[in-house]
């Protein structure tokens, strides 16, 4: 029997049962729409988590002293070459930022708290959450700004306000504890109070003068890390390989190594997406098979007549499957 005739019979049979076939088509549409929507929501959550991990002063790739991750202090800092610009062959660098990030104790007139003191170049911090903060008062003007900005929650706990002074105590590059007074330029509101309590920012040059090597006037300025944001996150391994060549004695790691918990959750989201897709498509497949069996069972006499009229068994099967 010509395949064209099989198609004609199949289409005619479809329109003989409009309610059943309409419900089946609606079920398929809902299953596909649900799978697409779930996949979109999961992917959105997954990449939002990636963005948050990267913007948390991490970047896609980071250069640090080899001992810094185990013992983060200025003793494990390094000198960045003057006028350094990261150039990675075949990989576009969307932005980069040198920083000093060390644990410190911050004291007001009434209270004290432990924080991460971060010396930054504000013009380069479009790669981190710092660029998205809302400030009360002023933000840091430039790399030489000797003031400090703290979180609104930290300011509340310290019982201080914009314009007042704070004393910061931290360990310098020579291993000695140093303290210095900073005037509060402003306070920032972040997405979570944990960020507001954890970080205090000042200009990078100010932090270098405060915590750097004072043994010689010609001592180079120090940083504890260089963070890079890539235009394509998937090229991070290429960037790591080339940066290890440029910084042979440093620890060069991507965000997955620096944020292992976020990396595991990112991978888990991939698995969850596949599981949900298989479950939805499995349910749809069972529904289709059930409908096919019901359609065959209610047409036993009709199919028997087709066989009696001489239609081969294989053609009957093909016609039902095509339908």
Predicted regions and their residues:
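Hydrophobic secondary-structure segments that place a key small or acidic residue at a functional site
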Residues: 99-100, 113-121, 135-205
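Hydrophobic alpha-helical transmembrane segments of multi-pass inner-membrane transport and secretion
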Residues: 18-45, 267-302
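Alpha-helical transmembrane segments of multi-pass membrane proteins
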Residues: 12-16, 314, 318-323
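Short, membrane-interfacial amphipathic segments enriched in basic
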Residues: 1-8
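Mechanotransmission and gating elements of multispan inner-membrane complexes involved in transport
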Residues: 172-273
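Solvent-exposed, non-transmembrane alpha-helical starts
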Residues: 72-79, 107-109, 114, 125-130, ...
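Hydrophobic, regular-secondary-structure patches
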Residues: 35-116, 138-144
